[in-house]
Amino acid sequence: MPLTLTRLDEKTEILIVEMGMTGFGEIDFLCQIAHPTHAIITGIGLVHAEYLGSQQGIARAKTELFRYLPESGAVALREKDRALVTPYLDECKANVIWCSDAADGGAVTSENVVLAAEKSSFDCHMPDATFHVELPFAGRHYVDNALLVTAVARAIDISVSDIQNGLGSAVSLSSSRMEMHPLAEDRLLINDCYNANPDSMIATLDVLAGYKPRPTIACLGNMYELGQYEVEGHAKVGRHLAERGIDWLICLGTLAEIIGEKR
């Protein structure tokens, strides 16, 4: 992130940076460098639980950014994370925008979600607008992320048409995350092995299940950095996999065996 800041010039209007962390105090340090005005917390899963102790610890580390946001700013959060972040909301002076499914009653919601094999779409409802969004990515988790992006984009006065065009033409910047590799004889390889965690693995399995009735094969390995959630995290994936009806399962690693046992 600091290297990115050195490339700014007088023409830069908006800078988007990722603040990654594996421990307490790291986002605090990055905020002192970047001075964010708006923020998104894409989710509070179990990644890095080994270092942060618990999901509540992960929430504490990610919400360190709250105290740096100005009153004129905004932060977009998932409604499903409300219980985890609520203890730290008193530190946030910025406007909090809750995002969710329409049934959950957030300020920015999705409805009529359609998840196709290699794309997704939904209707976005906001206090001042309702519009349709097409995403060039498969998976419900991309819809959730798009809601968060939309909430902050509107907070900085980006137009609805620009939001639609931007989301519709988005590209993945990370390797080994939901990479689609077409193969011979109409086969498709989905590579989502970068620092996998239970939430990301479940999301990928949902995408894979969307290709049925074509034969589906899941090749799953160990998930690391889960700490006390190590066994339950793998078991959770196994239970979900059983519900999705994947045809064949290959497990690589002693932890991944737990997935197979629960299937």
Report each predicted region and the residues it spans.
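Short, glycine/acidic-enriched loop or turn micro-motifs at the edges of active sites
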Residues: M21, L46, D81-R82, Y194-A196, ...
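Active-site beta-alpha connecting loops in nucleotide-dependent enzymes
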Residues: S174-S176, C193-R263
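AMP-binding/adenylate-forming
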Residues: E13-E18, L30, H35-T42
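Acidic, Mg2+-coordinating active-site environments of NTP-dependent enzymes
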Residues: H38-L188, P213-R214, R239-W248, A256-R263
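Residue-level marker for buried hydrophobic side chains located in beta-strands
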Residues: L15, V75, L189, A218-C219
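Switch II (G3) loop of P-loop NTPases
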Residues: T12-I27, L189-N195
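Alpha-helix C-terminal capping segments
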Residues: R7-L8, Q32-A34, A151-D157, V207-K212
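P-loop NTPase switch/communication element
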Residues: M1-I14
